[in-house]
Amino acid sequence: MRRKIVKIKKSYEFKKVYSNGKSVANQFVVMYYMENNLGFNRVGYSVSKKIGKSVVRNRVRRLLHESFRLLDIEIKTGFDIIFVARGKIVEADFHTLKNSMRKLIMKTPLYAGNEK
């Protein structure tokens, strides 16, 4: 059964993860994460105006969200996660982005592997 994805929306929640969390990055995405002790994951997406106009930014946000939704079963619970888009993300297709996000998750303690 799929878990409900709770989004981080408040700026103070983003700042908390940025300042207290750890990060990993690749050419498309920077991922910040920290434990939240809530028993479920919360996710946020940050796509700056440097990426492009609103149509492009919203498309990137949708791609990030869908990739996370599909990878959610591979992630342990109890974390706040923020994905920050980098400039090259505009050139990436969905499968490239999903694989790059999977590799980032596998580098961190978030990866559950075959536990579930």
Swiss-Prot record:
What is the recorded name of this protein?
Answer: Ribonuclease P protein component
Instruction: Kindly report, in one word, the top-level EC class recorded for this enzyme.
Output: hydrolase
Q: What do the Gene Ontology cellular component annotations say?
A: ribonuclease P complex
Q: What domain of life? A: Bacteria
Is RNA-binding set as a keyword in this record? yes
Q: Name one GO biological process term.
A: tRNA 5'-leader removal
Q: Which GO terms describe its molecular function?
A: 3'-tRNA processing endoribonuclease activity; ribonuclease P activity; tRNA binding
Q: Which keywords describe this protein according to UniProt?
A: Endonuclease, Hydrolase, Nuclease, RNA-binding, tRNA processing
- HAMAP family on file: RNase_P (MF_00227)
Similarity annotation: Belongs to the RnpA family.
One Pfam family, please name it.
Ribonuclease_P
- UniProt cross-references to PANTHER family, sorted A to Z: RIBONUCLEASE P PROTEIN COMPONENT
Instruction: Please verify whether the record's keywords include Amino-acid biosynthesis.
Output: no
Its gene? rnpA
What residue ranges carry the coiled-coil annotation? none
Listed EC numbers: 3.1.26.5
Q: Which reaction does it catalyse?
A: Endonucleolytic cleavage of RNA, removing 5'-extranucleotides from tRNA precursor
Q: Which InterPro entries match?
A: Ribosomal_Su5_D2-typ_SF, Ribsml_uS5_D2-typ_fold_subgr, RNase_P
State the species of origin: Thermoanaerobacter pseudethanolicus (strain ATCC 33223 / 39E)
SUBUNIT field: Consists of a catalytic RNA component (M1 or rnpB) and a protein subunit.
Q: Relate the protein's function as given in its record.
A: RNaseP catalyzes the removal of the 5'-leader sequence from pre-tRNA to produce the mature 5'-terminus. It can also cleave other RNA substrates such as 4.5S RNA. The protein component plays an auxiliary but essential role in vivo by binding to the 5'-leader sequence and broadening the substrate specificity of the ribozyme.
